[in-house]
Amino acid sequence: MKNAAVQKLSQTLEDDLPEVVRYVKNHNLGFFIPYNLNGDEKRYIPDFIACIDDGHGPDDLLNLILEVTGERKKDKAAKVSTARTLWIPAVNNEGSFGRWAFLEISDPWDAGNTIRAFLKDPDKVPEFVLK
């Protein structure tokens, strides 16, 4: 299921969202977000990073980390929480790596609508994305 979901999200980013300037499947890139699970240091490797023109212009693209939500594993909550509440605020506060955001995609077949809703109002992430 996860492979089909990842392929569908990739297709959506490629074909259906003109605001996506570029994207990459985060595979063997070395990009990870460190997190802690029960006292153990771990590495969270998100599925995609998309550079999106969200109205701030081509010189100020939004780096949107996208995670396709599959089955709920015990570490999923720790990964998502760390990315959303620690890593994103820290990298944005530091400022030299551009603007960053994080979004979980629970339904890759509706990813276009989910991403557009997020871009329209990032503070009102649909409830199904937050679970």
Question: What do these predicted ranges mean?
Answer:
Residues 1-131:
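Electrostatic, structured charged patches in enzyme active sites and in nucleic-acid/phosphate-binding
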